[in-house]
């Protein structure tokens, strides 16, 4: 491949759904359409348009997000590969980004499964998605679609919609689905994690209650849905219940616990660590921990598992929730680049970027309290052990 050749912009199974390298990170605004409380359906159905296999953890496949995936997404220019020879050897920044994606894949690929189902439906791809197997090119395409949630354009769009009310989100979904194209993935969040699903229809059991029908990769071919009460501005969703109408552990939330992400932001997404400026324009951290005793101090303020917003910086569970009780939760911290301090009191794995620093580390023990200080103008980290208690 020519080192200056940009990947083709197609939304398909093998070809990536991204454009080539260039910096990004401007804020995003949204336009909320009027709410039309009439039933609407896009024509997509979990079978045959969803995958027949369930959402899977990274350990379920021997495949990994690799240099070929990075080249498919961003091309093989100097910011991705160390030379023009094949195979590509990733630059330090590209390798760090790939490691972050692989860490994020630990709990599941629901984001990638939802995005690939939507894109294949829009492109009328064959064979039917339900007939595909979780191997080879299919698995790597799902990984690349999963990785789009870490692009600046995608994250900015998601943050903008997270500020809207649940009824605004229903209005946007209804307007989109009328076109016959499922343009949005849907994210729902609780303290136990986040999950990505694909809306394909909106029904109205009553005047003030919307039922958003979704393809849920945890339940292939299943009849799953998110219920939104327009009066209380609350939503409910059965994450783990076999019968979603009678789930004792149903997820509940309101404004800020539900968002949508347009497919267009993924198609126009750009390489987050490429461009004329050295380093990324935003801080992006992936924090994995079974405990909530961590915090991140940024120029905007401090965010944590229990305080998910400070200025332009947010901390939100990653949309890859595990069905295993007590499993570690992944959080995505995204915001203003500047001096960043990550403090944890127990085992925590962190991967990400801030300024020129791309890094990955794991603390050594649950009774060790540590702080990592990242300066965007430097390529080194300052590590402090705040205390250490023998077990």
Tell where the protein language model's regions lie, with residue ranges.
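Conserved active-site-adjacent core of cysteine acyl-enzyme catalytic domains
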Residues: 116, 120-194, 204-207, 217
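C-terminal motif of bacterial Sec signal peptides marking the signal peptidase cleavage site
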Residues: 18-20
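Active-site signature of cysteine proteases
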Residues: 190-261
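Bacterial signal peptide processing site
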Residues: 22-25
């Amino acid at each position: 491949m020519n080192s200056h050749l940009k990947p083709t912009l197609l939304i398909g199974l093998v070809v990536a759904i991204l454009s080539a390298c260039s910096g990004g990170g401007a804020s995003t605004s949204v336009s909320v359409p009027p709410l039309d409380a009439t039933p609407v359906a896009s024509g997509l159905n979990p079978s045959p348009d969803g995958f027949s296999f369930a959402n899977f953890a990274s350990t379920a496949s021997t495949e990994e997000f690799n240099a070929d995936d990075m080249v498919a997404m961003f091309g093989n220019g100097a910011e991705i590969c160390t030379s023009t020879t094949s195979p590509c050897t990733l630059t330090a920044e590209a390798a760090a980004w790939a490691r972050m994606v692989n860490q994020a894949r630990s709990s599941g690929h629901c984001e990638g499964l939802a995005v690939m189902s939507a894109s294949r439906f829009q492109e009328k791809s064959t064979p039917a998605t339900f007939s595909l197997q979780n191997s080879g090119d299919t698995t790597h395409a799902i990984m690349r679609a999963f990785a789009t949630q870490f692009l600046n354009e995608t994250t900015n769009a998601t943050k903008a919609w997270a500020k809207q009310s649940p009824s605004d989100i229903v209005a946007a979904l209804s307007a989109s689905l009328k076109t016959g194209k499922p343009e949005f993935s849907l994210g729902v969040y609780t303290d136990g994690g986040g999950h990505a699903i694909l809306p394909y229809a909106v029904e109205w059991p009553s005047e003030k209650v919307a039922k958003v029908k979704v393809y849920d990769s945890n339940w292939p071919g299943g009849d799953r849905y998110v219920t939104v009460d327009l009066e209380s501005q609350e939503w409910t969703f059965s994450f783990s219940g076999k019968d979603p109408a009678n789930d004792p552990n149903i997820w509940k939330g309101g404004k800020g616990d539900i968002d949508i992400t347009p497919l267009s932001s993924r198609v126009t997404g750009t390489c987050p660590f490429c461009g004329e400026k050295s380093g990324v324009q935003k801080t992006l951290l992936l924090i994995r921990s079974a405990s909530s005793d961590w915090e991140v101090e940024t120029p905007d303020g401090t965010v944590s598992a229990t305080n998910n917003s400070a200025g332009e910086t947010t901390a939100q569970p990653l949309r890859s929730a595990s069905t295993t009780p007590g499993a570690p939760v992944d959080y995505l911290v995204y915001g203003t680049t500047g001096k960043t301090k990550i403090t944890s009191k127990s085992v925590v794995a962190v991967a990400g970027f801030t300024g020129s620093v791309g890094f990955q580390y794991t603390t050594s023990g649950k009774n060790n309290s540590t702080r990592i200080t990242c300066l965007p103008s430097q390529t080194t980290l300052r590590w402090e052990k705040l205390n250490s208690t023998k077990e």
